[in-house]
Amino acid sequence: NPGNAAGLRQASIVWFRNDLRVHDNEALVSANRDSSSILPVYCFDPRDYGKSSSGFDKTGPYRAKFLLECVANLRASLRERGSDLIVRVGNPEDMLVNLAKSVGASGLYVHQEVTHEEQESEEKVSAVLKDEGVETKYFWGSTLFHPDDLPFKLHEMPSNYGGFREKVQNVHVRKTIEAPRQLKGLPQQGGVKPGDIPSLQELGLNPTTALRQDSQTAGGAMLVGGEGEALKRLQRFALEVPGQVANQAKAFSGSKSEGGGDSLYGANFSCKISPWLAMGCLSPRRMFEDLKKDGPRLKAATTANDDNGLNWLVFELLWRDFFRFITKKYSSGKKIHEAVPATASLAAV
């Protein structure tokens, strides 16, 4: 575009996957900065549904219902910022190349994932787009630590948690990236329609099964998908932690825990936030930052300096990092340090 004096890309696609949020989303922010227009896209891949070779649902109705809510909330957030979410049902390597042709996109911005199937999908998409002259730019945003900040190459990563934890104990956590207040509009070329979010039935699932979730779920609360709900949960979570720490400290000292709440270290308490982390509605760095602000209150809740809620949180997030990095290590021939570019502009907290 000769009139594009700023040297911006004419159009870019942002491929959302397990990063269904606008806060701390480097792929979205980078595309918005680099491009004159952006096309946010989410693909429901039919290969993620149906039955596995063992006869089990690849994606059950409860998880699918939660995912649909996450996608709907992401669409609402993007619309509030002047954009939209293009939704398609089909193989990403087909859907994305067709959209790129329609809008004349020159770049695809995407966060990398860790499993073998997810990486296969990345490679297929990258290959077909390369044939069309579209550059794929990879980012990383699913862990507490960025892989570029680790004190080892991924192929040299310790295979046990103890060794991993020892090596990363002095690694800083990068600051979260603020959610953009305004986004570039959709490309005018191509007249791409947003598309409808599919129903459970259209995904091949039984909707009556998922509706049973309207009764009681684990912990006695309904799980509602989406970034908005995730941030509300995080706020409540931060308020609950000091009380949980105090009760746990009393229990450890032999006193009876007051209030009869869930144990801080129990599965019930942990799962109050993990579903949103799994879908990427909540960034682990955002969770860490928000609870770090409550550090003084957490320490005041217990006299044991090495046993407060923040330390517990870091312990849980470190386990999550370990499993994601170890999965990446053994599920791909590509080295993560080669595939993910460093981002010098992001400082550490």
Q: What function would you assign to each model-found segment?
A:
Residues L8, E156-A347:
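Glycine/tryptophan-enriched, flexible segments
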